[in-house]
């Protein structure tokens, strides 16, 4: 597998989430936490969005983080001038190239190339130390020849080009094929960034395929928040990559902080962490079926793709249910210092199953039954 970096966009894409209304202090808290976690880039809202957005960009850029603070702006000279003045370490330009977005802004491909070069040239002269990325908005609904013409024209002048699945329609195969083609056009010097929306549930798979094909940067947000259904979630992306590059991922990021990041942003935007959320969801490491419970007691790797403790969470064994088995009951009894013969173990297991048929038992109720069974 290739090396890659994360551009976390919780403070840009995430601010476009319906329920998000981050204060300056919220943004500072998120940025510092992401920096401690090990995120390489933190993307913030365009400073031309509002007076407060500009102030926030300046504050975040001045924090002295290890992560590079970058801002995301439309490819316009006026926006670029403001972005340079904020002191950010990177400027991410975007220009719509699909027929839908060209109809909205009224430029054809030659005009897009001309204006992009003008804005890039300004940034290079005004702030030569700043990283520049150019992204074709709505990449995957753009004509391929148009895309490649734009990327080829700007590649000599930028550090990175971006591919954006703006409405989440791309398939993993499409992402792989297009990233490979863009890599061929821009050459080995220019980095490639992937930004994938999750409207059709492919954001994580698409991010992975982008890396497989040669992308070097992937955009994420905490909990995947963003416009509409959001984008590639940080936790989900790391779950995917950990199964393939465990040592690499563990070396780069302070993974045990992930629950803290998810809780923090959930609190700030007023939502609950989904029960089935990657890694930090309530049921992410729950085991209930008897066959699963037996295997987990013997070797957790049998039914877990990664150890929960790596990410600072714990597994949950649902022993007191109709699906339980004698191996799970025996293991729980032994944890309580209780020991049954084979016949008694079978009988108490069947008794617990019958009780659970009438309603879910709590662990406390199970423990009471096991203790009383010994003394009965």
Swiss-Prot record:
Thermal effects = Optimum temperature is 60 degrees Celsius. Activity is rapidly lost above 70 degrees Celsius.
Q: Which GO terms describe its molecular function?
A: citrate synthase activity; homocitrate synthase activity; metal ion binding
Tell me which residues this entry annotates as catalytic. Answer: 292 (proton acceptor)
Binding-site list for Mg(2+): 13, 195, 197
Q: Which domain of life is it from?
A: Bacteria
Q: Which SUPFAM superfamilies match?
A: Aldolase
| Pathway where this protein functions | Amino-acid biosynthesis; L-lysine biosynthesis via AAA pathway; L-alpha-aminoadipate from 2-oxoglutarate: step 1/5
Q: Would you tell me the Gene Ontology cellular component terms?
A: cytoplasm
Tell me one GO biological process term. Answer: lysine biosynthetic process via aminoadipic acid
* Keywords of the record: Amino-acid biosynthesis, Cytoplasm, Lysine biosynthesis, Magnesium, Manganese, Metal-binding, Transferase
Cofactor(s) listed: Mg(2+); Mn(2+)
Enumerate the spans annotated as Pyruvate carboxyltransferase domain: 4-259
Q: Where in the cell is it found?
A: Cytoplasm
Q: What happens when the gene is disrupted?
A: Cells lacking this gene show lysine auxotrophy, which can be complemented with alpha-aminoadipate but not with diaminopimelate.
Family statement drawn from the similarity comment of this UniProt entry? Belongs to the alpha-IPM synthase/homocitrate synthase family. Homocitrate synthase LYS20/LYS21 subfamily.
Matches recorded under NCBIfam families? LysS_fung_arch
Checking HAMAP family in the record gives: Homocitr_synth_fung_arch
Protein name, as recorded: Homocitrate synthase
Record the organism.
Answer: Thermus thermophilus (strain ATCC BAA-163 / DSM 7039 / HB27)
Recorded name of the encoding gene: lys20
